[in-house]
Amino acid sequence: MTRRSRAHNEKGQTMVEFILVLPVLLIVLFGIFQFGITFKNYISLTDAVRAGARTAAVSRYSASRVADTKARVKTASDLSGMADSDVDVQSTWAHGADVVVTAKYPYRISLLGVVLASGDLTSSTTERVE
């Protein structure tokens, strides 16, 4: 076999190996991408809950403290589709008592229309009422 024909055969082999490995590489890339989006949403949710808990901690005398807290959580996050029912505020509102703000945000990971995983991202923060 001459050098030229051997190199030509190896070029075809390389192409076949690439085609076999490509789906695995794409799935790994997709997984990294989806994990990044989900993690970004979790960080945004955590920051929004922290901002809402801080608002609740300083609004002890406000008549609309729960509504204000829920509104603060929703506006502090850049997550779309968050409803009032997704945010929970618990406290006795006494000076020095704890206020617990919990929020959830649904996530769904799908590949080509097939849902691989779904659930709720949940974050909770506790602050002391001032």
Language model: regions and residue ranges:
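Short, conserved structural patches
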Residues: T2, A51-E130
